[in-house]
């Protein structure tokens, strides 16, 4: 049996769950922590890796939806898949049932492979998908909704309607604020955000090294 086939359930490292809605600046904050020497595991990156050419995930998707779901270079046609599952709950449920266990298993493996004093798990749907159960503490990157919308429209070049539908599909800002252990306001100057993040980082180091 290959190492990948063995199901790993225990996490040996101290884990900080980092989350926030679309356009809140999760990547910028995780990059700052990475610059401080902290290993980062990104759920979105893993979600792409489990459907790379040659992966079991992509093979299953092609078997289910047909070869038309592939681009000419053999990669997954993400926009075509998004259209298929967006308005069809049966397709959406099938896809989630396939991918969620693959993503979770790789997340656990990557968290255990981290060698820094603590490890960050970045996940936009940390609470929604129950990934917070793998975390010792959680940090919400928070901005007002109008800032979220403005940043996302500008960054992703998508319509206001699309942004609002993405936000509506996520847990509300208020719910996330209630669930998170710590909140970092990212609607300020980079200097202030860095200052507060370093203070949080020092606290996490103390907790992790206890």
UniProtKB/Swiss-Prot annotation:
Pfam families: CoaE
Catalytic reactions on record: 3'-dephospho-CoA + ATP = ADP + CoA + H(+)
GO CC annotation terms, alphabetical: cytoplasm
Primary subcellular site in the record, as a coarse category: cytoplasm
DPCK domain mapped to chain residues: 15-210
Any Gene Ontology biological process: coenzyme A biosynthetic process
Keywords from the named record: ATP-binding, Coenzyme A biosynthesis, Cytoplasm, Kinase, Nucleotide-binding, Transferase
EC numbers, comma separated: 2.7.1.24
Pathway annotation from the record: Cofactor biosynthesis; coenzyme A biosynthesis; CoA from (R)-pantothenate: step 5/5
The keyword Signal is annotated on this UniProt entry: no
Localisation per UniProt entry: Cytoplasm
Superkingdom to which the source organism belongs: Bacteria
GO molecular function terms attached to this record: ATP binding; dephospho-CoA kinase activity
Residues binding ATP, per UniProt: 23-28
Cited NCBIfam families: dephospho-CoA kinase
Family designation: Belongs to the CoaE family.
HAMAP family: Dephospho_CoA_kinase
Protein task: Catalyzes the phosphorylation of the 3'-hydroxyl group of dephosphocoenzyme A to form coenzyme A.
Name of protein: Dephospho-CoA kinase
Organism of provenance: Pseudoalteromonas translucida (strain TAC 125)
Gene assigned in the entry: coaE
